[in-house]
Amino acid sequence: MVDTTRLTRAVDHFADRLRAAPQSRLQRNGAAEALALARELARRAQLLEAPGVEPREMPDAGMFAAADQITVAVHDLALVLVDEGQVADAVRLVEEAQKRAGV
């Protein structure tokens, strides 16, 4: 089993920043970036769990749910990652999304 602590910490930090962000920041780009990240993390988890099956898209639950969506998606992904390269790639995605979100 691979250590995913770096990944879950990165997402927890991003989620905390989203929860603390003003509504105006979420509306500008914070929530959209978080949703895009959650969808990508969920897609990757589904592809690892069921190769060859078309992944389902995570629904948009609204800007105030964005932090929860990335948290759920990363925990699902963390359960199926098999090597450090996958963890590092996912951490990079989280860090880039947080920068674009401006939080």
Question: Predicted regions span which residues?
Answer:
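Short terminal alpha-helical segments
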Residues: 1-42, 94, 98-100
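Amphipathic alpha-helical binding modules
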Residues: 68-103
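Amphipathic protein-protein interaction modules
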Residues: 46-82
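Intrinsically disordered or highly flexible coil/loop and linker segments, enriched in small
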Residues: 20-27, 47-54, 103
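Alpha-helical rod/repeat scaffolding segments in eukaryotic adaptors/tethers
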Residues: 4, 23-34, 56-63, 80-87
